[in-house]
Amino acid sequence: SCSASLGMDVSYEKVFEVLDEPIIPIKLVEVVQKIPTSRGLGSSASCILAGVLIANDILHNGNSLSQDMIFQIASSIEGHPDNIAPLLFGGLTCSFKNDKYYTIKSEVSNNFKFTLCIPSFELKTSDARRVLPKEVSMSDAVSNISHSVALFKALELGDMELLKNANIDKLHQDYRFPLIKGSEYFIEFAKNNNATCMISGAGPTILLISNKTLNIQYDGWEIEELKVNNFGAYIYEE
């Protein structure tokens, strides 16, 4: 079941509030959440977005929401757009907030193989945030900005060499990797197998990106090779 179903309920009702419509009660017979919780994979955001999409589908009578309104509502409930944007639009997204939430989307190259390494243990986001420094140096901030732009482009182009060189972070991974027991194995594996390694979200899941299928196993960790969804979320009937 979906541990974040409360988020789904809140987001479902929020759509009716925004559209000034009476809430149409529904009964969720079964909610299947395939995204592991508390693993840095955006499970709560997926439930929030599901609630908005379900409400929008039920209200599909000429008074439904635009994609941008769906994005705004779901992001406001989540508190940031970082997970909502790729869930809704698919592909590779870069998001920020000014007067509202903004995102830009690009498609990820199919040259890459994405391997998720999911541990059996959880890491609370609050704990992952607690280890971060309150301030960072100007040089570290500049380094992350420049490398982030290159990382975005490398994923778009399918350039493995550029991706490996662009995947240099000075703001959070050095502080968080020590919280993830076993992470040193994946870091070393990536170095030896023409891959690059990063923390998914705040952790503890680790993402390996390569241009080939990786034959990797580690006791207590679930390994999954996933494909990129470049088209985003939608409602379908089974």
Q: Where are each of the predicted segments found?
A:
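Beta-strand segments within the central parallel beta-sheet cores of soluble alpha/beta enzyme folds
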Residues: 26-31, 65-76, 146, 166
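DPxDG-like acidic metal-binding loop motif
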Residues: 41-64, 88-90
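ATP-binding N-lobe of GHMP and related small-molecule kinases
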Residues: 1-39, 57, 61-63, 220, ...
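Glycine-rich, charge-dense phosphate/pyrophosphate-binding loop(s)
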Residues: 155-238
